[in-house]
Design a protein with these regions (language model features):
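Amphipathic alpha-helical dimerization/coiled-coil segments
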Residues: 2-7, 95-112
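A general structural signal marking secondary-structure boundaries and capping sites
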Residues: 43, 72, 108-112
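Recognition helices and adjacent regulatory flanks at domain boundaries
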Residues: 1-18, 52, 64, 85, ...
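Short amphipathic alpha-helical/adjacent loop interface patches that line ligand
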Residues: 43, 53, 65, 94, ...
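Basic, amphipathic "hinge/linker" alpha-helix immediately C-terminal to the N-terminal HTH DNA-binding motif
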Residues: 28, 80-103
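N-terminal helix-turn-helix DNA-binding core of bacterial DNA-binding proteins
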Residues: 14-60, 87
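Canonical helix-turn-helix DNA-binding module
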Residues: 46-84
């Protein structure tokens, strides 16, 4: 709510910050939770993630991994091998999502 002299000027709905909206911006992609779920079990390579999530295309997986890395949920480590080896690991920020995923799993078991 914004006050201007004696006039009330309501904030536009799109300018009101919402923590849920911010969270969904970080982890709300179609494949994000599945990638995060697999990384809870430990560091994975691209090919491992693709095998564990067979419905995701390589392009979608690459996009999801880049997005999660940009948002600080996971980190990417490149090893100078031939061919190049790349591993993905959850950051502490990503690990904090464990409780949320667990609750979503319980909700789905109850209601779907």
């Amino acid at each position: 709510m914004v006050m201007n002299a004696n006039n009330y000027i309501p904030k536009e709905p799109e300018t009101i910050e919402c923590n849920i909206e911010k969270t969904l911006d970080v982890i709300g992609g179609k494949w994000a939770f599945l990638v995060i779920r697999e990384l809870f079990c430990g560091t994975k390579r691209f090919g491992e993630l693709q095998r564990l999530i067979p419905a995701v295309s390589p392009r979608a997986l690459t996009s999801t991994l880049r997005h999660l890395e940009e948002k600080g949920v996971l980190e990417r480590q490149v090893f100078p091998t031939v061919p190049v080896t790349v591993e993905y690991t959850l950051t502490p920020k990503g690990e904090d999502l464990h409780a949320i995923l667990k609750q979503m799993k319980l909700w789905a078991a109850k209601w779907t």
